[in-house]
Amino acid sequence: MYKRIKGTEDIFGDDIKYWYYIENVVKETVRLYGYSEIRTPIFEATELFIRSVGEETDIVQKEMYTFEDKGQRSITLRPEGTAPTIRAFIENSMMATGLPKRLFYIGPMFRYERPQKGRQRQFHQFGVELIGSPSPLADAEAIIVADRVLKNLGLLNYTIKINSIGCDKCRANYKNALKEYYSDKLDYVCDDCKRRYNTNVLRLLDCKVDVEYIKDAPKITDYLCDDCKHHYEETKRLLDNLKIKYVEDPLLVRGLDYYNGVVFEIHHGDLGAQSAVGGGGRYDKLIKELGGSQTPSLGFAMGIERLIIALKNEKIPVEEIKNNEIFVAHLGEQARIEALKIAEDLRDNGISVVFSTMERGLSAQLKHAARLKCKLCVIVGENELERNIVILRNMETGEQIEIERDYVVGTAKEWIEG
């Protein structure tokens, strides 16, 4: 017997309603802000992620699913959604239709890491990208959209953490301060941090092992230039004016190399040590780095599996999918033909119908309808058909009535709507 690959999940049954719910809330929320959907391939040229995410990041070093195809091209299953979206923006000359461009995506991503609750090797994200605006208004909008998505989902126990990691000049001064701080600690840090010290010292702040050193590290907000400080303060002022709650975290740097300026993360209190459900920030140099024109941009993404855990932990009621509202049972050859017509009439009126496709007795058909949790059962028999009537049965109460064939749809709708 074949089994699913480690780090993947089969999604079905009652869990599906959470996926429908999140996807619908996301699409409706971002529509309010003028975002259009984009769908990119799940695999891209490996170089795209090396150039964008950063060669020294854990994603590129340890987590990417990379293989050589039959044309000897290095291909990678996408580990995140921003780089493919920006590649599509450049390749399809989207700048020609005007800026800023607002795009969103929903889909699977892939990272080879230790599977745990809410973190699989195939996982799903939705993301939002606001391309072409240098204004703090854009930074504020991204955070506002993220906050509204969470509110519209019904979540309460979340925290938005924000910071600024400045421009190249700010970070150069800050990196020197970090190097000095860690210089007498290199004998005590993990092997990854020893490597990061020489390749990208900012990544030391991502370490999950040597956290005791991180809390006393220098704060980048003390090294911001006047322009970056003003941009950060203006972003916070805009959020304050709209009463968007946030917490400043001066050690927040994000795990991808393309970020600059304002960055943020969303954490949920019911997710334990791995509490992040999403994050994002500004990436003003990424489009030029990938072959386009200098275009200031920013975005964020959230993990759908993580959001589902948060919804369940907060006991947010999620509407059941309206499947299997009516079961149509039949007894006899002529009854079967008429029952099929009735099923289609009901579907024409937007009612979900399960039609019995098995040669079974009435008792077996009713048991099947009960297992499917159908609300009603329409029973079509040869004797009833001769009198131009059918039986309508309430599967919850057992009550049933005879009605004329022509009134099946109207009566069924009344019963369903209660």
Swiss-Prot record:
Subcellular location: Cytoplasm
GO cellular component labels: cytoplasm
Classification via Pfam families: HGTP_anticodon, tRNA-synt_His
Reaction(s) catalysed by this chain's protein: tRNA(His) + L-histidine + ATP = L-histidyl-tRNA(His) + AMP + diphosphate + H(+)
Keywords: Aminoacyl-tRNA synthetase, ATP-binding, Cytoplasm, Ligase, Nucleotide-binding, Protein biosynthesis
One Gene Ontology biological process: histidyl-tRNA aminoacylation
Family recorded in the similarity comment: Belongs to the class-II aminoacyl-tRNA synthetase family.
The protein's name: Histidine--tRNA ligase
Organism this protein belongs to: Thermosipho africanus (strain TCF52B)
